[in-house]
């Protein structure tokens, strides 16, 4: 962990707890996987985890995902399955993100307008607390969960891996169940733009052509809660 974090190791005091948690999960996996070749985890991360263990599991989740063991947050079973599919197809680390907010107008004008062929409605911020694998971040820093720290002592919210997501082509994919018990999935192609987010968590400035329409008529209308980012794997995903 120290080698991976390098200068981003801003919370060295929490590393022993995180390391022990990771080893415990790996031991549990080996004890329970049986004949299964592959493993994926839908893990508990809040609100009870940090008060019981004294840290958040985000960094460990990111490391396991980087090992080929996808871990979803908030016991998100369909997110876990989506990550597993993305891992198998791309043969690369994936991450779960929320479609968090639109790109601020001043950021769009300063860093995107005239430089990329996207309208502001084509762009958005993809965010999660800090569960993205380090090799998918431009740089990474160990920090604390700012959202949780609004209601809890900061020292029990340490353990997020934060940084801007590496720019490049991406595929969005999500599998989800509907209220009438049907499986549905969406997929879209786009890119992460080389734009500084000036924010926290694992986060990036994303762009998909016609994202405004896609958001309204697919994500909202069909009740998809969040997204999955992988490497550029759309052709293989269509085969799946």
Task: Tell me what each language-model feature is.
Residues 1-54:
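A charged, amphipathic alpha-helical module
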Residues 51-56, 107-111:
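Short acidic, glycine/serine/threonine-rich loops at helix termini
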Residues 53-68:
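Acidic catalytic cores of enzymes that act on phosphate-bearing nucleotides/polynucleotides
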Residues 65-205:
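C-terminal catalytic subdomain
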Residues 229-234:
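Conserved small/polar residues in nucleotide/adenosyl-binding loops
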């Amino acid at each position: 962990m120290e080698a991976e974090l390098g200068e981003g190791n801003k919370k060295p005091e929490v590393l022993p707890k995180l390391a022990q948690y990771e080893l415990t999960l790996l031991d549990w996996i080996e004890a329970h996987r049986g004949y299964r070749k592959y493993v994926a985890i839908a893990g508990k991360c809040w609100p009870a985890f940090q008060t019981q263990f004294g840290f958040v599991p985000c960094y460990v989740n990111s490391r396991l995902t980087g090992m080929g063991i996808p871990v979803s947050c908030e016991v998100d079973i369909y997110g876990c399955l989506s990550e597993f599919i993305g891992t198998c197809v791309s043969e690369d680390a994936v991450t779960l993100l929320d479609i968090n907010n639109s790109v601020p107008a001043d950021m769009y004008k300063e860093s995107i307008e005239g430089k990329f062929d996207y309208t502001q409605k084509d762009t958005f911020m993809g965010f999660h607390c800090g569960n993205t694998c380090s090799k998918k971040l431009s740089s990474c820093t160990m920090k604390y969960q700012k959202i949780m720290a609004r209601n809890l002592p900061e020292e029990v919210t340490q353990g997020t891996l934060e940084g801007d997501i590496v720019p490049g082509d991406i595929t969005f994919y999500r599998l989800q169940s509907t209220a009438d018990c049907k499986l549905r999935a969406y997929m879209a192609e786009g890119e992460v733009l080389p734009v500084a987010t000036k924010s926290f968590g694992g986060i990036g400035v994303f762009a998909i052509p016609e994202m405004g329409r896609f958001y309204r008529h697919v994500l909202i209308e069909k009740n998809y809660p969040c997204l999955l980012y992988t490497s550029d794997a759309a052709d293989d995903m269509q085969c799946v």
